[in-house]
Swiss-Prot record:
Protein function: Catalyzes the irreversible cleavage of the glycosidic bond in both 5'-methylthioadenosine (MTA) and S-adenosylhomocysteine (SAH/AdoHcy) to adenine and the corresponding thioribose, 5'-methylthioribose and S-ribosylhomocysteine, respectively. Also cleaves 5'-deoxyadenosine, a toxic by-product of radical S-adenosylmethionine (SAM) enzymes, into 5-deoxyribose and adenine. Thus, is required for in vivo function of the radical SAM enzymes biotin synthase and lipoic acid synthase, that are inhibited by 5'-deoxyadenosine accumulation.
Organism domain of life: Bacteria
GO molecular function term, any single one: methylthioadenosine nucleosidase activity
Name listed for the protein in its UniProt record: 5'-methylthioadenosine/S-adenosylhomocysteine nucleosidase
Assembly mode: Homodimer.
Keywords: Amino-acid biosynthesis, Hydrolase, Methionine biosynthesis
Family: Belongs to the PNP/UDP phosphorylase family. MtnN subfamily.
Gene Ontology BP annotations: L-methionine salvage from methylthioadenosine; L-methionine salvage from S-adenosylmethionine; purine deoxyribonucleoside catabolic process
Native source organism of the sequence: Yersinia pestis bv. Antiqua (strain Antiqua)
UniProt-listed Enzyme Commission number(s): 3.2.2.9
């Protein structure tokens, strides 16, 4: 088994990359892919860059060059669920774009033309993540994660997103693009992110302060998931 792991930023991948054994690096089109073994599993760790285009391009390179059996998107997210606080975990049941709008042609908010309204995470991977959450005794929510090419900071975008997606648990900038590409490649995926900020008017300040906390928590989750997969054989 080979596991693809995707993080957007240096802070989101460095703790994992430093632990990869027999590490090799592929640099292509602004992305870096690190291959080797981590916690007993063959891995391909992608640092994609920030935003939907970077995430889609990097995920495509990862799937084409490394052909992982599954993909886990790690990193940080802004919490919209009222129960979430910094360091808590959000696990995707589905991902959607919050900044796509072709509703004039009969599509749902966030739905791209010719595509599903949502990209649904793999149930077995969700169960794996939630099992690890229980083992680690972390606070977590399973729910909708919405993505767009904007850092959500202020009342107006929050109001718009919550109105269009009432069940949204968290927002960030890559997950829906990753889910979109995995859907096209028929590759199972799940998003497991740690909350770095609560999406309010001061979210940019808390993001800068707590990104390291979120990176440590999401890394803890990835390592636990890999260990469980290795034990299953």
């Amino acid at each position: 088994m080979k596991v693809g792991i995707i993080g957007a930023m240096e802070e989101e991948v460095t703790l994992l990359r430093d632990r990869i054994e027999n590490r090799q690096t592929l640099a292509r089109a602004g992305c870096e892919i690190y291959t080797g073994q981590l916690n007993g599993i063959d891995v391909a760790l992608l640092k994609s860059g920030i935003g939907k285009v970077a995430a889609a391009m990097g995920t495509t390179l990862l799937l084409e060059h490394c052909q992982p059996d599954l993909v886990i998107n790690t990193g940080s997210a802004g919490g919209l669920d009222s129960s979430l606080k910094v360091g808590d975990i959000v696990v995707s049941n589905e991902v959607r774009y919050h900044d796509a709008d072709v509703t004039a042609f009969g599509y749902e908010p966030g739905q791209m033309a010719g595509c599903p309204a949502a990209f649904v995470a793999d149930e077995d991977l969700i169960a794996l993540a939630e099992n690890c959450i229980q083992q680690l005794k972390l606070n977590a929510v399973r729910g909708l994660i919405c993505s767009g090419d904007a850092f959500i900071n202020g009342a107006e975008p929050l109001t718009r997103i919550r109105a269009a997606f009432p069940t949204v648990a968290a927002v960030e900038m890559e997950a829906a693009a990753i889910g979109h590409v995995c859907y096209l490649f028929n590759t199972p995926f799940v998003v497991v992110r740690a909350i770095s900020d609560v999406a309010d008017q001061a979210s940019h300040l808390s993001f800068e302060e707590f990104l390291v906390v979120a990176a440590k928590q999401s890394t803890l989750m990835i390592k636990a998931m890999l260990t469980t997969l290795a034990q299953r054989g």
